[in-house]
Amino acid sequence: MKNTMNTPVAIPVSKLHPFEGHPYKVLDNEEMNTLIESIQTQGILSPLIVRPMENTTDEYEVVSGHRRLHAAVKAGLETVPAFIYALDRDAAAIAVVDSNLHREHILPSEKAFAYKMKYDAIKHQGTSSQFETKQRSDVVLGADSGESRAQVQRYIRLTYLIPELLTMMDEEKIALSVGVELSFLPEQFQYDVLEACEMNDCTPSYSQSWHLHQYYKDGALDKYLIFKTLSEEKANQRETIKVPVNRLRDIIPEGFTVKQTEDFLVKAADYYTRYLHRQRDRER
Protein backbone atom coordinates (compact mmCIF):
# COMPACT_ATOMS: atom_id res chain seq x y z
CA MET A 1 0.00 0.00 0.00
CA LYS A 2 1.55 3.32 -1.08
CA ASN A 3 0.34 6.88 -1.13
CA THR A 4 0.31 8.36 -4.61
CA MET A 5 1.26 11.98 -5.37
CA ASN A 6 1.63 12.68 -1.68
CA THR A 7 -2.01 11.98 -0.95
CA PRO A 8 -3.13 10.08 2.16
CA VAL A 9 -4.42 6.53 1.93
CA ALA A 10 -6.99 4.76 4.11
CA ILE A 11 -5.30 2.21 6.36
CA PRO A 12 -7.16 -0.27 8.61
CA VAL A 13 -6.58 0.58 12.27
CA SER A 14 -5.68 -3.07 12.85
CA LYS A 15 -2.61 -2.56 10.64
CA LEU A 16 -1.30 0.40 12.66
CA HIS A 17 1.00 0.06 15.66
CA PRO A 18 2.39 2.59 18.17
CA PHE A 19 5.98 3.65 17.59
CA GLU A 20 8.29 1.47 19.68
CA GLY A 21 9.37 3.46 22.73
CA HIS A 22 6.86 6.24 22.05
CA PRO A 23 7.62 8.70 24.88
CA TYR A 24 4.32 10.58 25.02
CA LYS A 25 1.35 9.35 27.03
CA VAL A 26 -2.01 8.78 25.36
CA LEU A 27 -4.55 9.47 28.09
CA ASP A 28 -8.31 9.05 28.27
CA ASN A 29 -9.01 12.53 29.60
CA GLU A 30 -11.20 15.52 28.75
CA GLU A 31 -9.01 16.49 25.81
CA MET A 32 -9.30 12.97 24.42
CA ASN A 33 -13.09 13.05 24.79
CA THR A 34 -13.16 16.31 22.82
CA LEU A 35 -11.01 14.75 20.10
CA ILE A 36 -13.26 11.68 19.92
CA GLU A 37 -16.33 13.89 19.51
CA SER A 38 -14.59 15.89 16.78
CA ILE A 39 -13.66 12.73 14.87
CA GLN A 40 -17.19 11.37 15.21
CA THR A 41 -18.64 14.51 13.63
CA GLN A 42 -15.91 15.63 11.21
CA GLY A 43 -13.61 12.66 10.77
CA ILE A 44 -9.82 12.93 10.97
CA LEU A 45 -8.92 16.31 9.50
CA SER A 46 -5.14 15.85 9.74
CA PRO A 47 -3.89 12.50 8.36
CA LEU A 48 -1.49 10.39 10.39
CA ILE A 49 2.13 9.89 9.35
CA VAL A 50 3.26 6.27 9.35
CA ARG A 51 6.18 4.18 8.14
CA PRO A 52 6.26 0.58 6.89
CA MET A 53 7.35 -1.89 9.56
CA GLU A 54 10.36 -4.03 8.78
CA ASN A 55 9.79 -7.67 7.86
CA THR A 56 6.01 -7.29 7.59
CA THR A 57 3.43 -6.86 4.85
CA ASP A 58 1.09 -3.88 5.05
CA GLU A 59 1.84 -3.27 8.74
CA TYR A 60 2.74 0.26 9.77
CA GLU A 61 4.28 2.07 12.71
CA VAL A 62 2.75 5.42 13.67
CA VAL A 63 5.19 8.33 13.53
CA SER A 64 2.71 11.15 14.13
CA GLY A 65 -0.89 10.76 15.26
CA HIS A 66 -0.95 8.39 18.24
CA ARG A 67 -3.72 10.37 19.95
CA ARG A 68 -5.73 10.61 16.72
CA LEU A 69 -5.44 6.86 16.21
CA HIS A 70 -6.57 6.16 19.78
CA ALA A 71 -9.51 8.53 19.38
CA ALA A 72 -10.42 7.00 16.02
CA VAL A 73 -10.56 3.52 17.56
CA LYS A 74 -12.71 4.88 20.41
CA ALA A 75 -14.96 6.56 17.84
CA GLY A 76 -15.45 3.23 16.05
CA LEU A 77 -13.51 4.00 12.84
CA GLU A 78 -12.16 0.98 10.99
CA THR A 79 -9.75 2.92 8.76
CA VAL A 80 -7.86 6.20 9.12
CA PRO A 81 -6.17 8.45 6.53
CA ALA A 82 -2.38 8.41 6.65
CA PHE A 83 0.70 9.47 4.73
CA ILE A 84 3.18 6.61 4.29
CA TYR A 85 6.86 7.54 4.36
CA ALA A 86 9.81 5.17 4.07
CA LEU A 87 11.71 6.46 7.11
CA ASP A 88 14.50 4.57 8.84
CA ARG A 89 14.36 4.09 12.60
CA ASP A 90 16.49 7.15 13.44
CA ALA A 91 14.67 9.56 11.14
CA ALA A 92 11.33 8.26 12.40
CA ALA A 93 12.39 8.66 16.05
CA ILE A 94 13.36 12.28 15.42
CA ALA A 95 10.04 12.91 13.66
CA VAL A 96 8.11 11.31 16.55
CA VAL A 97 9.73 13.67 19.04
CA ASP A 98 9.50 16.78 16.86
CA SER A 99 5.81 16.23 16.10
CA ASN A 100 4.96 16.51 19.80
CA LEU A 101 7.69 18.63 21.35
CA HIS A 102 5.90 21.94 21.01
CA ARG A 103 2.61 20.79 22.54
CA GLU A 104 1.26 23.11 25.22
CA HIS A 105 1.32 20.51 27.99
CA ILE A 106 4.25 18.08 28.16
CA LEU A 107 5.02 16.15 31.34
CA PRO A 108 8.63 16.10 32.60
CA SER A 109 8.76 12.32 32.12
CA GLU A 110 7.54 12.69 28.52
CA LYS A 111 10.14 15.33 27.75
CA ALA A 112 12.84 13.21 29.41
CA PHE A 113 12.23 10.12 27.29
CA ALA A 114 11.56 12.21 24.17
CA TYR A 115 14.91 13.97 24.52
CA LYS A 116 16.62 10.61 25.17
CA MET A 117 15.05 9.08 22.07
CA LYS A 118 16.03 11.98 19.83
CA TYR A 119 19.49 12.24 21.41
CA ASP A 120 20.19 8.56 20.69
CA ALA A 121 18.84 8.88 17.13
CA ILE A 122 20.98 11.93 16.31
CA LYS A 123 24.02 10.29 17.88
CA HIS A 124 23.42 7.11 15.87
CA GLN A 125 23.01 9.04 12.65
CA GLY A 126 26.44 10.59 12.98
CA THR A 127 27.02 13.24 10.35
CA SER A 128 23.63 13.79 8.74
CA SER A 129 22.60 15.86 5.80
CA GLN A 130 19.85 17.19 8.04
CA PHE A 131 22.36 18.79 10.37
CA GLU A 132 25.36 19.06 8.02
CA THR A 133 27.95 19.59 10.78
CA LYS A 134 29.37 17.28 13.42
CA GLN A 135 27.84 18.97 16.43
CA ARG A 136 27.28 17.33 19.78
CA SER A 137 23.94 15.55 19.84
CA ASP A 138 22.77 17.46 22.92
CA VAL A 139 23.74 20.78 21.29
CA VAL A 140 21.66 19.96 18.20
CA LEU A 141 18.77 18.75 20.36
CA GLY A 142 18.94 21.88 22.50
CA ALA A 143 18.87 24.12 19.43
CA ASP A 144 15.85 22.25 18.04
CA SER A 145 13.93 22.40 21.32
CA GLY A 146 14.90 25.92 22.36
CA GLU A 147 16.70 24.73 25.50
CA SER A 148 20.33 24.82 26.57
CA ARG A 149 22.61 21.79 26.27
CA ALA A 150 22.75 21.61 30.08
CA GLN A 151 18.95 21.58 30.35
CA VAL A 152 18.71 18.82 27.75
CA GLN A 153 21.20 16.78 29.78
CA ARG A 154 19.18 17.34 32.96
CA TYR A 155 16.01 16.02 31.35
CA ILE A 156 17.82 12.98 29.94
CA ARG A 157 19.12 12.23 33.46
CA LEU A 158 15.51 11.82 34.57
CA THR A 159 15.24 8.62 32.50
CA TYR A 160 17.33 6.97 35.23
CA LEU A 161 14.63 7.59 37.85
CA ILE A 162 12.35 4.80 39.00
CA PRO A 163 8.75 5.15 37.71
CA GLU A 164 7.39 6.18 41.11
CA LEU A 165 9.76 9.15 41.40
CA LEU A 166 9.01 10.13 37.80
CA THR A 167 5.32 10.16 38.67
CA MET A 168 6.07 12.46 41.61
CA MET A 169 7.80 14.79 39.17
CA ASP A 170 4.85 14.73 36.79
CA GLU A 171 2.57 15.55 39.73
CA GLU A 172 4.87 18.48 40.65
CA LYS A 173 5.66 16.99 44.05
CA ILE A 174 9.41 17.19 43.43
CA ALA A 175 11.34 19.67 41.32
CA LEU A 176 13.46 18.96 38.24
CA SER A 177 16.67 19.74 40.15
CA VAL A 178 15.69 17.23 42.85
CA GLY A 179 14.96 14.53 40.28
CA VAL A 180 18.33 15.08 38.62
CA GLU A 181 20.21 14.58 41.90
CA LEU A 182 18.21 11.47 42.80
CA SER A 183 18.77 10.02 39.31
CA PHE A 184 22.41 9.36 40.21
CA LEU A 185 21.40 6.95 42.98
CA PRO A 186 21.14 3.21 42.22
CA GLU A 187 17.61 1.87 41.89
CA GLN A 188 17.51 0.30 45.37
CA PHE A 189 18.51 3.57 47.02
CA GLN A 190 15.82 5.35 45.02
CA TYR A 191 13.25 2.92 46.40
CA ASP A 192 14.62 3.63 49.89
CA VAL A 193 14.07 7.35 49.21
CA LEU A 194 10.50 6.59 48.15
CA GLU A 195 9.90 4.52 51.30
CA ALA A 196 11.31 7.30 53.50
CA CYS A 197 9.06 9.85 51.79
CA GLU A 198 5.99 7.69 52.39
CA MET A 199 6.86 7.02 56.03
CA ASN A 200 7.60 10.68 56.83
CA ASP A 201 4.85 12.05 54.56
CA CYS A 202 7.38 14.35 52.94
CA THR A 203 9.17 15.08 49.67
CA PRO A 204 12.92 15.66 49.36
CA SER A 205 14.24 19.18 49.00
CA TYR A 206 17.08 20.06 46.64
CA SER A 207 19.47 20.31 49.59
CA GLN A 208 18.49 16.86 50.86
CA SER A 209 18.72 15.22 47.42
CA TRP A 210 22.08 16.92 46.78
CA HIS A 211 23.45 15.59 50.05
CA LEU A 212 22.20 12.08 49.24
CA HIS A 213 24.01 12.27 45.89
CA GLN A 214 27.22 13.39 47.61
CA TYR A 215 26.96 10.63 50.25
CA TYR A 216 26.61 8.10 47.43
CA LYS A 217 29.63 9.51 45.56
CA ASP A 218 31.65 9.24 48.77
CA GLY A 219 30.56 5.64 49.27
CA ALA A 220 28.82 6.48 52.55
CA LEU A 221 25.16 6.19 51.57
CA ASP A 222 22.97 3.52 53.13
CA LYS A 223 19.29 3.14 54.01
CA TYR A 224 19.79 4.54 57.51
CA LEU A 225 21.41 7.73 56.16
CA ILE A 226 18.61 8.14 53.60
CA PHE A 227 15.95 7.94 56.33
CA LYS A 228 17.94 10.23 58.63
CA THR A 229 18.39 12.86 55.90
CA LEU A 230 14.76 12.85 54.81
CA SER A 231 13.43 12.97 58.37
CA GLU A 232 15.22 16.26 59.01
CA GLU A 233 13.00 19.31 59.04
CA LYS A 234 13.25 21.41 55.89
CA ALA A 235 13.38 25.17 56.07
CA ASN A 236 10.14 25.47 54.11
CA GLN A 237 8.40 23.07 56.51
CA ARG A 238 9.15 25.01 59.71
CA GLU A 239 6.17 26.68 61.28
CA THR A 240 6.15 30.45 60.97
CA ILE A 241 3.96 33.21 62.34
CA LYS A 242 3.21 36.25 60.20
CA VAL A 243 2.24 39.58 61.76
CA PRO A 244 1.29 42.62 59.65
CA VAL A 245 3.95 45.35 59.91
CA ASN A 246 1.38 48.03 60.76
CA ARG A 247 0.57 46.18 64.00
CA LEU A 248 4.20 46.43 65.08
CA ARG A 249 5.01 49.94 63.89
CA ASP A 250 4.38 51.55 67.31
CA ILE A 251 6.17 48.78 69.20
CA ILE A 252 9.43 48.18 67.33
CA PRO A 253 12.17 50.84 67.75
CA GLU A 254 12.79 52.78 64.55
CA GLY A 255 15.66 51.61 62.36
CA PHE A 256 15.67 47.99 63.55
CA THR A 257 16.79 45.34 61.04
CA VAL A 258 14.72 42.20 60.44
CA LYS A 259 17.02 40.21 62.74
CA GLN A 260 16.87 42.86 65.46
CA THR A 261 13.08 42.95 65.14
CA GLU A 262 12.87 39.16 65.49
CA ASP A 263 15.08 39.19 68.60
CA PHE A 264 13.09 42.08 70.08
CA LEU A 265 9.77 40.26 69.61
CA VAL A 266 11.09 37.03 71.13
CA LYS A 267 12.38 38.91 74.19
CA ALA A 268 9.13 40.87 74.46
CA ALA A 269 7.08 37.66 74.31
CA ASP A 270 9.31 36.08 76.96
CA TYR A 271 8.98 39.14 79.21
CA TYR A 272 5.18 39.20 78.80
CA THR A 273 4.93 35.48 79.54
CA ARG A 274 6.85 35.95 82.81
CA TYR A 275 4.62 38.92 83.64
CA LEU A 276 1.48 36.76 83.21
CA HIS A 277 2.96 34.09 85.49
CA ARG A 278 3.62 36.68 88.21
CA GLN A 279 0.04 37.96 87.89
CA ARG A 280 -1.35 34.44 88.35
CA ASP A 281 0.84 33.87 91.40
CA ARG A 282 -0.49 37.06 93.04
CA GLU A 283 -4.10 36.02 92.44
CA ARG A 284 -3.70 32.71 94.25
Question: How does the language model describe each region?
Answer:
Residues 149-270:
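Amphipathic alpha-helical extensions and coiled-coil-like segments
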Residues 265-283:
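Conserved TIR/SEFIR loop-to-helix hotspot centered on a Trp-containing motif
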Residues 42-46, 125, 130, 190:
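Glutamine-centric residue-chemistry signal
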Residues 126-129, 200, 279:
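Secondary-structure edge/capping motif, primarily at the C-terminal ends of alpha-helices
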Residues 20, 70-160, 184:
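Amphipathic, charge-rich alpha-helical segments that serve as recognition/docking helices
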Residues 1-85, 91-102, 272, 283:
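Short, charged/polar connector segments at secondary-structure boundaries
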